Design a protein with these regions (language model features):
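GST-like domain detector, emphasizing the conserved glutathione-binding G-site
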Residues: 1-25, 30-106
């Protein structure tokens, strides 16, 4: 079952699950975490500073340890790794912000 719901509990797009790789002390990660809180979505943090398995998964998938990176798993099973805090915030806002969606439709 999807862990990706927006405000009001509606399931979003074709995304099955999201996970943010980073750590709370990182200012760029903080930017993404703040957006997640404002959008009221459930995105687990995979703390790369305290869990070497998360850090290894990030390095294996992206070839780098730079954070934040959003792991996006689609329903059909494909996985995308999205780096850069502003790109992540834009991705999340485009999919989960009701006001942004209403402006695009109207």
């Amino acid at each position: 079952m999807s862990n990706v719901t927006g405000a009001g509990g509606k399931w979003v797009d074709d995304v099955e699950s999201l996970a943010l790789y980073g750590y709370p002390e990182c200012p760029y990660c903080r930017r993404v975490l703040n957006a997640i809180a404002v959008l009221e979505i459930d995105v687990p943090l995979r703390n790369t500073m305290i869990d070497s398995d998360h850090n290894a998964a990030l390095l294996a998938a992206t070839g780098r340890e730079t954070v934040p990176v959003l792991r996006i798993e689609k329903q059909e099973g494909s996985i995308r790794w999205l780096p850069e805090s502003l790109d992540i915030v834009r991705f999340l806002t485009d999919r989960f912000d009701r006001e942004t969606k209403a402006m695009k439709q109207g």
